[in-house]
Amino acid sequence: MAAYSLTIKPSAMKELQVVLDKSTLSRLIEKIQLLATQPRPSGSEQLAGRSNLYRIRQGSYRVIYSVDDQLRVVDVVKVGHRRDVYR
């Protein structure tokens, strides 16, 4: 299976920099990198009402991303604490 191209929006990159816990940050980065080879990993869920948006969890944090299968692109659009990320 060919890999997907992975892009991270600048706003999502800023949100990643806010994560203070270094172990959580490293696990978030690891999970984001894995999206390039497996865009819909076990535990990912499609967001209700959004045909192309998915989320993965890492502790209390969520990564919201879109998948374009035709262009083979995964675009990380938002990263944040679960209480804030869906707003």
Please describe what each predicted stretch is.
Residues 1-58, 69-75, 84-87:
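Basic, Lys/Arg-enriched alpha-helical interface segments
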Residues 66:
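Conserved Hanks-type protein kinase catalytic core
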Residues 80:
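Residues forming the ATP-binding cleft of Hanks-type serine/threonine protein kinase domains
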